[in-house]
Amino acid sequence: MVRNLLKFCLGLLYFRGRGKMRNFFCDCFPSPDNKLLKFSSGIRNNPNKDDAFKKATQWLSSMSADISLDSNGLSMPSYSVAAMHFLDERLKKEMKVFEFGSGLSSLFYARKCKSVTSIEHNQEWFEKITSHEIKNLAVFLKNLNSENGDYEKAIFDFDEQYDLIVVDGRNRNKCIFNCIKKLTKNGVIILDDSHRDKYLPGKQFLEEQGFKSLKMFSPASSKLTFTETTFFYRTGNCLGI
């Protein structure tokens, strides 16, 4: 009931106040070329206002569908909207991706990149994602409560080095501790929901290892909340940060 009311109000604002809404959404959905990617009055003068407004209307469509969608109606990760669009414009076909936690993001990366290896602990999600039978997407079911750490150490089961390692599942700090050795020299680590205090040990560890961070705080895709997605990178990284 509340969600539907909010959708109606947002839709009304869209049709009745396009000029003011462009300014608001330009703050919420800034251009990926602005590395700060946060609210700023200066962004109001950004020439990419129409692009920001387009992204905002896409966000409204995602909320209506209750899943994150791109402009073509295809699934996208449930990251912060700013991070989602940033990735959409910078991913390359030759990239290899590893995910701790499968989902709509797995389908998105499979469309954009060379290969995706995803670890999942939930049987239902595992069956849902594997049912798509995508050739360049491999999903593996791992025991979350194993004494041997089967889930967080699963990345060592594979010989590959990865351009992107996405930490968006369970035991995120432990996953972060394990993933550096499997990252290419120009690789990037993505931590979703990075605003949560419980992930501070993992973030501090990466900073101690010489990684810089790019935080993207914006509305969450398909949700009426704000969230943060952080990219941990080094000089000369594959996303051009």
Segments from the language model and where they lie:
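Generic detector of well-ordered alpha-helical packing
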Residues: 100, 121, 169, 193-194
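Membrane-proximal basic amphipathic "stem/tether" segments
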Residues: 1-74
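Generic enzyme active-site microenvironment
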Residues: 97, 118, 166, 190-191
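A short acidic, Gly/Pro-enriched loop at the edge of an enzyme's catalytic core
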Residues: 154-164
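C-terminal substrate-binding/active-site "lid" region of AdoMet-derived donor-dependent transferases
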Residues: 164, 170-241
